Amino acid sequence: MAKKIIGSLKLQVKAGQANPSPPVGPALGQRGLNIMAFVKEFNAKSADLEPGTPTPVIITYYQDKSFSLELKTPPASFMLKKAAGLAPVGKRNRPKGSTKPGREVAGSVTVAQIRKIAEAKMKDLNANDVEAAMQIILGSAKSCGIEVKG
């Protein structure tokens, strides 16, 4: 018989750097899930990604307090900022887009880079083909203040 699903939880954790401190520990602890088991499994599954890449993960937890993980691709904004070569700034040391998108340009990417990002994100996007996925990524680029050349 299949396990009974109690619920699911969405978190964004840096690849290979999950630890029991907030936000992971409290989110799992209040649901009675084994935090260290999650940390070990997540770090093992995200080992092939570049360390520190923000990785969305969906945790489905069951009645017997077991869980399953589903890793998603990094956010489009992160991939765009990385492709545009934006330098990390601020106290969290993350790349930052334009403070005034549409008026100020933070960086630029090519159509080929947009296509590459769209192909990588294809399984997580609600798009039927790469062209539709590219339009979604173009919208994200515009929101970040990144111009597209070519």
Curated annotation (Swiss-Prot):
The lineage of its organism: Bacteria, Pseudomonadati, Pseudomonadota, Alphaproteobacteria, Rhodobacterales. One or more lysine residues are methylated. GO terms for cellular component: cytosolic large ribosomal subunit. It comes from the Bacteria. Part of the ribosomal stalk of the 50S ribosomal subunit. Interacts with L10 and the large rRNA to form the base of the stalk. L10 forms an elongated spine to which L12 dimers bind in a sequential fashion forming a multimeric L10(L12)X complex. Keywords: Methylation, Ribonucleoprotein, Ribosomal protein, RNA-binding, rRNA-binding. GO terms for molecular function: large ribosomal subunit rRNA binding; structural constituent of ribosome. The keyword rRNA-binding applies. It comes from Cereibacter sphaeroides (strain ATCC 17023 / DSM 158 / JCM 6121 / CCUG 31486 / LMG 2827 / NBRC 12203 / NCIMB 8253 / ATH 2.4.1.). Belongs to the universal ribosomal protein uL11 family. This is Large ribosomal subunit protein uL11. The keyword Protein biosynthesis does not apply. One of its GO terms (biological process) is translation. Forms part of the ribosomal stalk which helps the ribosome interact with GTP-bound translation factors. It holds the Pfam family Ribosomal_L11_N. The gene is rplK. InterPro entries: Ribosomal_uL11, Ribosomal_uL11_bac-typ, Ribosomal_uL11_C, Ribosomal_uL11_C_sf, Ribosomal_uL11_N, Ribosomal_uL11_N_sf.
